[in-house]
Amino acid sequence: MLESMYYEFFFIFPKERELFESFLLDATDLALEESSLEDLKAFDDKETIGFISQSSWRYFATHGPLKEDLKEKLPHLDHFVILRSEKDLNSSLIPALESFCLSLQENLQNEFDFFYLSRNLASKDWLEAYKQAILPVQCGKFYIHPSWHQKPSHIATDFSIMIDPALAFGSGHHESTSMCLELLSNLDLKHKNALDVGCGSGILSIALKKQGVSTLVACDTDSLAIEETLKNFSLNQISLSTQDEIICGSTQKIQGHFDIIVANIVADVIKSLYSEFVRLCNHTLILSGILETHLNSVLQIYYNGFEILEQQQRNEWVALKLLKKQSIN
């Protein structure tokens, strides 16, 4: 019997990483993992470190030679994206990514490039290695753990969240999600009504419910995210009240006002939602998923309607806790 295989792709996007990651999500409906050599060293993943350090990366550019193997020059490995699939996507995804790169060049009048590697692994070997590498993480008062790690007895159930990272859109391991959870940890949300925009895996919605919000509305334009949110609600034994809603769609489907809004999404979407957040927010707005290079453009838009209460930064990612100015309606 042939052994089932798993395919692993590594990407480096020197420019506009958010746009490339959004394209990968739309093109594959697969979860992405952002990583670095330091992350792999922390997990003692010597095999993967050897593979990405010693392999000849493929390179595509809209300028110079369009495609080549890098034999001696290695790309900067501080940040790369990992995508895993049960199918070999080399013949479909890579050409699509090249076309996307060329379309960005045409639309943005700039040069773009990316690096990539791929390999195939036995499914059982990859799954076992993956489980050994994913460890629980503390985010503020929340203890985030995968289903194969039991919660320690000293951790309160109220602050324990079970998420399987590779099967979800947010797990607490990414800087943007962990900062959101830390900012939420310091808030008294009992009897407040809350909105989670771009709910993904539902991790922030679960945190809001565990903090005692009276009403929760969560939305995402991706139907797969809605499925993940509902699955993780069940996994964490979170019950929805008659006032709670999980909506497949944008904020335009939502009415009312909310004491707390959280949005862990890309900066371009955050900027486009300013008027919606002014309409929906009564008090506190937490924004995350903002790359440092996009922070000033976000602040320029939000300055008129919100004041900054707290700003956090971890590596290149920034999270903001904002207060709505009462003069803005």
UniProtKB/Swiss-Prot annotation:
Q: What name is this protein filed under? A: Ribosomal protein L11 methyltransferase
Output the HAMAP family linked to this UniProt entry. Methyltr_PrmA
A GO cellular component annotated for this chain's UniProt record is: cytoplasm
List residues binding S-adenosyl-L-methionine. 177, 198, 220, 264
| Alphabetized Pfam families for the sequence | PrmA (PF06325)
Source taxonomy lineage? Bacteria, Pseudomonadati, Campylobacterota, Epsilonproteobacteria, Campylobacterales
Keywords (A to Z) from UniProt: Cytoplasm, Methyltransferase, S-adenosyl-L-methionine, Transferase
CDD domains in the record: AdoMet_MTases (cd02440)
Task: Name the Gene3D superfamilies on file.
Answer: Vaccinia Virus protein VP39
Task: Fetch the PANTHER family from UniProt.
Answer: ELECTRON TRANSFER FLAVOPROTEIN BETA SUBUNIT LYSINE METHYLTRANSFERASE (PTHR43648:SF1)
Species name: Helicobacter acinonychis (strain Sheeba)
Q: Which reaction does it catalyse?
A: L-lysyl-[protein] + 3 S-adenosyl-L-methionine = N(6),N(6),N(6)-trimethyl-L-lysyl-[protein] + 3 S-adenosyl-L-homocysteine + 3 H(+)
